[in-house]
Regions:
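Short, Lys/Arg-enriched N-terminal segments with co-localized hydrophobic residues
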Residues: 8-23
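Acidic, surface-exposed loops and disordered segments
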Residues: 20-223
Length: 223
């Protein structure tokens, strides 16, 4: 019995230590993530690395779990160069290892929605289905807003997960929308929200511009 108690105590301590390591890694990723402007164009990501990253990204939250983001992952060099041109000549897409274009599917709410809660009860599935209809049917503004919110959540997941993997990233919104849409064959019921380049920095990011003081941006209970 004494031996079992010792083993149990050691197991608990290991769990606590593991949790602290994860917590510290998360804090470090947040603090060290920067928008990289110059990427090492010789660095390549393996297909397994891309898959591992995207498996984390699809755990990002979405309203009603409708998973209304769609991701275009680009490693093909000629296509990356086309994207750089659409990005007004910026070098990040062509030099980075991976370009992820985050798009929103504005019709996800009605595309077999029961599957979004396939592991739940029938009652739960029907409840979600009806809630989706109420919120999004005949409301293109809600559809668009929700897609943008979902891609925002996913974008931060991409950047922090990439940092945790020892990679760097750069979010980008400066591009010619119609040109990029043509390159990726964007469906009519989708919109491009942003793109994120992932790779290895060729040079450090410039110093942070400086954050506003907390008391200017954080308010307790109300404005």
């Amino acid at each position: 019995m004494v031996i079992l108690k010792i083993i149990k105590i050691k197991s608990i301590k290991l769990q606590i230590l593991f949790s602290l390591i994860i917590l510290m890694d998360t804090f470090e990723a947040i603090n060290t993530r920067r928008a990289i402007k110059k990427f090492d164009n010789t660095h390549k990501m393996t297909s397994e690395q891309v898959k591992s990253l995207m498996e984390l990204v699809i755990l990002s939250p979405t309203s009603y779990n409708q998973q209304n983001w769609r991701f275009i992952t680009v490693t093909d060099q000629p296509i990356k160069e086309q994207i750089s041109k659409a990005a007004r000549g910026q070098s990040q897409p062509s030099d980075g290892s991976l370009v992820i274009i985050l798009c929103g599917n504005m019709n996800a709410w009605k595309q077999d929605p029961l599957r979004y809660w396939k592991n739940s009860t029938t009652d739960k599935q029907e409840h979600v289905k009806n809630a989706l209809i109420t919120k999004y049917a005949d409301n293109s503004q809600n559809q668009r807003d929700e897609a943008i919110r979902s891609c925002g959540f996913a974008g931060q997941t991409i950047m922090l997960a990439a940092k945790q993997m020892g990679l760097d990233s750069c979010p980008m919104v400066g591009f010619e929308y119609d040109e990029l849409a043509k390159i990726i064959n964007l469906p009519e019921d989708h919109l491009i929200v942003l793109m994120i380049v992932v790779g290895k920095a060729a040079e450090p990011a410039s110093p942070r511009g400086g954050q506003l003081p907390l008391d200017e941006v954080v308010f307790e209970n109300k404005f």
